[in-house]
Amino acid sequence: MEIGTSLKINMIIALFLTIVSEGIFSLVIINFLKFPVIFSIIFLLILWLIQWLISPYLVERNSVEVTRDDPSYGWVYELVENVARRAGIKTPRVFLVDEPYPNAFAYGNYVTGKRIGITIPLLQILTTEELESVIGHELGHIKHNDVEIGLAIGLIPSILGFISNILLTVGWATLIFAVDEFDILVGLTMLAIGGVLFVITFFLQLFVLWFNRLRESFADYFSYELFRERAWNLAKALAKIEIYMQNIRLDPFRGIIVTIPPTKVKESDPDLLIEDLLREKTNIFSDILSTHPHPAKRIKMIYKLTKPMIF
C-alpha cells in the first residue's frame, strides 16, 4: 500500500479509537457524578475554545514577528512565503523564538492567524534547503488543521490528569497530617480516585500520542509531496537536530509546542547518524510515550520515499 494512503487510514483508525475511548470514559465518569451530559459537553467546548484562543499568546512568549522587510531575517519570511505558495495555502505569520534548542512548530488559529515559530539555533545549523523542508513539514500541520485537532483530543486527558494530580497531592497531604480515622479515610479515598484517574489518563494519552505520531509522519509525507527528491533534506535536518540536542532532555507531554524528542548520538556527522538510524531496529515501544515517531522511523520513511529518485 502506498505510504500516504496507509498513513491516512491509520490516522482515521487512531482518531476513531481515541474519540471512542475518551467518549466511553467520559460518559462513565459523568454518569457516576450525576452530571448532565449536555452541560458537560458545553463545559468541554468552552474549555476548548478558551484554550484555542489563548494558546497562541502563551506559545509565542520570547518571540518576535518577522516580516519581508526585516533587514536580518526577511529571507526567512520569504522562504516561508515561497513554500506556502507551493503548498497552496496562505502564508502564515512567522515568528523567531528565543529558545536554546533548534525547533520549529506550527500554532495559531483563525482569529490570531496561523503562525510558524522558528528558533534561532535552527537557523544556525540548517542549510536553506534543509530549513525549507522543515517549513514544508510545519505547513503540513497548518493545512491539515493539526493544531485544532490536537487541542480537541488532548483536552479530556489533560483535564483528567489535572484532577488526578490534585487528588493524589491532597490525598497524600491529608494522610500525612491526619489527626483521626476520618482524615485517613478521606485521604485514602482521594488516593484511590486519583489513582484510577491517573490510570485512565495514561491509557487515553497512549491513544493521543499514537495519533500525534501519525500526524507527524503525515507532515513529513506532506513535505515530501512538496519537494519530492529534495525532501531528503528533511532527513538531514532531523539528523542535525538530533546531534544538537544530544544533551537536552525535553518532556514529551509539553502540549501544543511541537518538539522533537532527543536521542543519544555518538557521531557529529549527520550522514553517519543517518546511516546508523537506517540500520537501527525499532518496534512499537520505541516511541510509545513520544509525541513524535522515533527518529529512525522518520528517516526510514523519508529514505523509502526518496530512494527511487536520488539513490
Curated annotation (Swiss-Prot):
This is Protease HtpX homolog 1. One of its GO terms (cellular component) is plasma membrane. CDD domains: M48B_HtpX_like. Belongs to the peptidase M48B family. HAMAP family: Pept_M48_protease_HtpX. Binds 1 zinc ion per subunit. One of its GO terms (biological process) is proteolysis. InterPro entries: HtpX_protease, Pept_M48_protease_HtpX, Peptidase_M48. It comes from the Archaea. Its EC number is 3.4.24.-. Zn(2+) binds at H137, H141, E216. Keywords: Cell membrane, Hydrolase, Membrane, Metal-binding, Metalloprotease, Protease, Transmembrane, Transmembrane helix, Zinc. The chain crosses the membrane at residues 12-32, 35-55, 159-179, 184-204.
